[in-house]
Amino acid sequence: MKLSLDWMNDFTPLKEVGLDVILKKIAVSVCEIDGVVPFRPELDFVKIVRIESLDKHPSADKLQIAEVFDGSSKSQIVTGATNVKVGDLVPLAIPGAKLGDREILESELRGVKSSGMFCSEKELSLSEESSGVWILNGIEGAEIGKTIRSFLYYEDIIFEIDNKSITHRPDLWSHFGFARELASQLRLPITFNPFESLWNFDLSMKFPRVLENQNAHSYYASSICEVFVIPSKRKFQSRLQKCGIRVINNVVDVSNYVMLEMGQPTHFFDKRFLESQGGVSLEVSYAKKGESFALLDETSPSLEEEILLIRNQGRPVAVAGVMGGKESAVQNNTTEIVMESAVFAREKIRKSIRSTGIRSDSSVRYEKGLEATTTLPVIRRALNLLKENGCPSLKASEPVGFLHTPHKEVRIHTDIHFINTKLGITLSQGDITDILERLHFMVSWKGDRLEALVPKFRHNYDVTIPEDLVEEIGRTRGYDTIQVTPLLAEIKTPIRNLSRELERKCKTFFSVGLGYHEVYNYSFQALKENELDGDVELSVKIRNEMPEEQSVLRNSLISSLLKNIRTNQDRFSEIKIFEFGRAYFNIPEPDNEKKFFSFAVSFDRKSSESDLGLLEDDFLKVRKEIESFLKYIRIFEYFWDIKPEIFFHPGASLSLIVDSKQIGNLGYVHPAVLDSFELKKRVIYGSLEFEKLVEIWNTNRNISRFNVPSQFPEAEIDISILIGEKENTNLFTDLVRREKIPELQEGWVYSQFAGGSVPVGKRSVSYRFRLVNYEKTFTQERIKEISDHLVALAGKNGFVLR
């Protein structure tokens, strides 16, 4: 948001204080400042001069030599302008001026000295097009010797305020509101209050009809006649331009001017158009689904039922608090208007912004929550400004409408001990009273007990509890004046947070050790995405009004990770990501919220890839990574069980079992799910239930499993057998483990194969077993003996050797 120092000076004498003092106080006690810049300082080097004489250039037919007077001295200018004559007042850029990327220098043109350049409005960046030098004859304020910056009311300092730092302060979203705050902080008087403007309404005028309902906090309208639509005066134009608002005409400009000055949006309708619909009868009501009409920005959005509209005779003429309709807008030939001043519930405006995608200056203020009692004072102020800005004889009917939220009182009770304890300093009752009264609170004391009546422009959402009073006192006094007190605390060994420790181990292992990238996602998603993993009836719906794609809390992390892969699938050939996140269920505590460690891998395999060998190799690679992680966190006793999941491919889905509990799963995402997420490559997804993982890790972490390395060479035995397509590969390794062969250290699957010479419905699985002897070197006889044992074991249990 941009604020003009010159404009704020209308309300309190800020220029008497000094810019450095103002900036420091804003930064310490009010909000963050993004920038402080003089407005168009380059125009100080462009002066208004009078052309005293014009002569032809001796060496160029298209050039003229002009002698000009700036009020104190004369100078010579060579110009090619054809629209100038003797006696004209024109802008002259003197040597040293910088206009855009051009610097004006004293030069010679065809042997004749030229001390500057006549300027057009386009060259001064005041207009996109111009037809020659800007002629200022007869324009109010155009005086010889005056700079163009002064002539245009551009001599000003602009404060660029960080909007995020005043989101909770709707009273600061205006020049008067900000000036009022600075006056309180700097002990300055309020010299003019626009909310106290007066106006004599014409009681004989026919007033508009306003249908009362509960769809607005406050809504008033007034008919205005004898309006003349002309360009705004320089003062109005300059102030709007300095705040980044496009100048349109004197009527529309006043509406924008009032909004920037007082923080209250207004709207003007062309009364002639409203009467053409059967008379002026305004109503605040909701849109019908699919309803549409043309807006001022030339769009015609299809409206939802939650959007609030302004209707005349039942027909939409504006999206309430957001934007007016094109047909009812003020035209160049408009002579009668209807002024609207209203306050709508901030929640309703937020819905309209979200649904239409339109974020106007008005809606930004409405969504913060405005004080409803300001609607009538704003009408009186706007009428005074219209009269000043080109409509000297206008008349207005008495406003009609309703106010459903009359002024309420918010009283906060606390005591001096509470305030001093929170701030960490000792303030007297007088100190506290002085600060709060400067901030427009009404204060009374009963002993050490304080009662503060909150000013109406702060009581809606801002100051409501004792802690808010403490903040007001602290920031006004200045947090920089409060001494830092060292924290007094016992030195104790911190309690170990096992969950956090294991989470760090997981992140380190997967990111540093395996090359995964961590991602962060919101917990909001669409209801249909919860169908992937569980009963949608158990979905936790978000009570706030949210779009459909963010209407529930997720019940697993799979949708979030698949969307991450979709976003990145065209940028990387291989994607490996993981996330720590929570899933939510509409069931009693403590099972209503669970934390998961989930991961997804997308190798460079198209979703239509049919080479089972490649797919199995990828799957085994990821499975081996998970097993190495389990070993890293000292979980050695586990097995994989075949268990289908609705989001996994039916032939590639495993459950991880530890201590007879399922703690996770792993599998290829089902092709139908890949298609629904528009994924082009195969995806392997896995998830571990983190609380269970922490519990098992806590049990195992202190158990020593260290084995002294053998000084003798290790040996390996490979064996390949046929098993069913859906048979668990752990069956054979479990059989071998139960044989308790002394030298057997571990065994695992290192390859699988199906098709070719392998019978239909079967697959060839190759196992590798590592042998370690701590007493002597392996002999060929002992290795063969163990190998024969394994072959016999396979045959005994119905497995066919390959």
From Swiss-Prot:
Residues 710-802 form the FDX-ACB domain. GO terms for biological process: phenylalanyl-tRNA aminoacylation. GO terms for cellular component: phenylalanine-tRNA ligase complex. Mg(2+) binds at residues 462, 468, 471-472. Its cofactor is Mg(2+). Residues 40-149 form the tRNA-binding domain. Binds 2 magnesium ions per tetramer. Disulfide bonds: none annotated. It is an enzyme of class 6 (ligase). Keywords: Aminoacyl-tRNA synthetase, ATP-binding, Cytoplasm, Ligase, Magnesium, Metal-binding, Nucleotide-binding, Protein biosynthesis, RNA-binding, tRNA-binding. It comes from the Bacteria. Tetramer of two alpha and two beta subunits. This is Phenylalanine--tRNA ligase beta subunit. It comes from Leptospira borgpetersenii serovar Hardjo-bovis (strain JB197).
